[in-house]
């Protein structure tokens, strides 16, 4: 009797990526005029000078936001610092977050090339709204997914969660035969928009960086030949909390919306720990230290100083974080979706420039998510050869 040949399970792979943004584009050079006009702070020249400097240092050229001047005029409590406005903010986000997620999902599904009925799992991640049933439930309806799709909803994880969802999708795909996981991260930062005040200057930093966006990633193991074209293999994941950094990024749900605090120590915390968490991440792969310059990177750009610290402490050559800096410049900090935008930019640029792999011609790479805790979540990726 001939031996039975079994298909060995493979690591989960990213099979498609889709992204979406609201239609409203805000150029950074014009944003200070907009912000101080709509919040009725044009007389605050001292604060305006400070905000101008923050915008100049942000290295962000433009962002996409759902919020418009007309919405603010209709809802003045949103731009009045401390005024109760949680209800109207949540009413906006509970509708718009699933819709933006739907737009990104349809792009990913189109690239994937498989019937939508083959999606078995859905992970939805947002920090913008907290209704029950949640955005996962709403997206099931918007996309017409099977009501028996296994859903997981992640609320209020923050900016590191773009890597978290890859870890979860990997587990689902590798432990459920034939699973195809739709991962969606979507943020509408209307909940974080505030009027200006002398007592809470962190708001100025958020106003210069935060933006709206959604990403959708389809993950599965054992891709179907000639139908599914993998982009990246998810090899290993690791999460850690940086010591004594709890105050670094904090957000609280209050009647005034989501009140947040951003410590100037965050770049220092990341820079002081990046070699350690990178070393421990790659120990899970082969137990060896990597030449960091041999990797491709998708680093959550919580701000330019964080990106600079990662580059400096790892001794990266100029241009190693090109994709990260490009997304920060063209989209701002969109929270969890941002690292997926970076991977999308990277694979597109790799194809455009005739590279051999989706990871800028390199084999190994890493996604670094950074957020409240301070929590760092890393995902080791292996690129795929470009054959199209």
Curated annotation (Swiss-Prot):
Active site residues according to the UniProt entry: 159
Leading EC class: transferase
Disulfide bonds: none
Listed Gene3D superfamilies: 3.40.47.10
Assigned EC number: 2.3.1.208
Biological process according to GO: 2-hydroxybenzoyl-CoA catabolic process; 4-hydroxycoumarin biosynthetic process; coumarin biosynthetic process; polyketide biosynthetic process
Thermal dependence of activity, per record: Optimum temperature is 35 degrees Celsius.
GO molecular function (one): biphenyl synthase activity
Catalytic activity, as annotated: 2-hydroxybenzoyl-CoA + malonyl-CoA = 4-hydroxycoumarin + CO2 + 2 CoA
Acyltransferase as UniProt keyword: yes
CDD domains xrefs: CHS_like
Pfam family for this entry, one: Chal_sti_synt_N
Keywords attached to this entry: Acyltransferase, Transferase
Domain of life per record: Eukaryota
pH dependence (record): Optimum pH is 6.5-7.0.
Induction note: Up-regulated by elicitor.
Self-association state and partner proteins as the record states: Homodimer.
Function: Type III polyketide synthase involved preferentially in the biosynthesis of 4-hydroxycoumarin from salicoyl-CoA. Can also use benzoyl-CoA and malonyl-CoA to produce 3,5-dihydroxybiphenyl as a major product and benzoyldiacetic acid lactone as a minor side product. Can also use m-hydroxybenzoyl-CoA as substrate, producing m-hydroxybenzoyl diacetic acid lactone as a derailment product. No activity with p-hydroxybenzoyl-CoA, CoA-linked cinnamic acids or acetyl-CoA.
Similarity field: Belongs to the thiolase-like superfamily. Chalcone/stilbene synthases family.
Protein name listed in UniProt: 4-hydroxycoumarin synthase 2
Lineage per the UniProt record: Eukaryota, Viridiplantae, Streptophyta, Embryophyta, Tracheophyta
């Amino acid at each position: 009797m001939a031996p039975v040949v079994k298909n060995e399970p493979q690591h989960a792979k990213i099979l498609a990526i889709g992204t979406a943004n609201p239609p409203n584009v805000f150029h950074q050079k014009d944003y200070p005029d907009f912000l101080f006009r709509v919040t009725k702070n044009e007389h605050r020249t001292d604060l305006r000078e400070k905000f101008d400097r923050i915008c100049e240092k942000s290295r962000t050229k433009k962002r996409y936001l759902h919020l418009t001047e007309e919405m603010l005029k209709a809802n003045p409590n949103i731009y009045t610092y401390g005024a109760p406005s949680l209800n109207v903010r949540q009413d906006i986000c509970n509708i718009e977050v699933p819709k933006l997620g739907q737009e990104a999902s349809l792009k990913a599904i189109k690239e994937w090339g498989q019937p939508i009925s083959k999606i078995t799992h859905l992970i939805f991640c947002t920090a913008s709204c907290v209704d029950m049933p949640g955005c996962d439930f709403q997206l099931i309806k918007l996309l017409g997914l099977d009501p028996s799709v296994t859903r997981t909803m992640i609320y209020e994880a923050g900016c590191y969660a773009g890597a978290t969802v890859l870890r979860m999708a990997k587990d689902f795909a590798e432990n459920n035969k034939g699973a195809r996981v739709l991962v969606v991260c979507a943020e509408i930062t209307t909940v974080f928009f505030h009027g200006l005040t002398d007592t809470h200057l962190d708001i100025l930093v958020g106003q210069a960086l935060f933006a709206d966006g959604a990403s959708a990633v389809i993950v599965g193991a054992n891709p179907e030949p000639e139908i599914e074209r993998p982009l990246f293999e998810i090899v290993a994941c690791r999460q850690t909390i940086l010591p004594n950094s709890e105050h670094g990024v904090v957000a609280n749900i209050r009647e005034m919306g989501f009140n947040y605090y951003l410590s100037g120590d965050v770049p220092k915390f990341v820079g002081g720990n990046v070699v350690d968490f990178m070393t421990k991440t790659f120990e899970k792969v082969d137990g060896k230290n990597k030449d960091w310059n041999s990797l491709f990177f998708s680093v959550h750009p919580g701000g330019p100083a964080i990106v600079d610290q990662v580059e400096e402490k790892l001794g990266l050559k100029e241009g190693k974080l090109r994709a990260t800096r490009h997304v920060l410049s063209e989209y701002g900090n969109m929270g969890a979706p941002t690292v997926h935008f970076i991977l999308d930019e990277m694979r597109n640029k790799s194809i455009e420039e005739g590279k051999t792999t989706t990871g800028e011609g390199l084999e190994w790479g890493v996604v670094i998510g950074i957020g409240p805790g301070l929590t760092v979540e890393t995902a080791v990726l292996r690129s795929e050869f470009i054959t199209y």
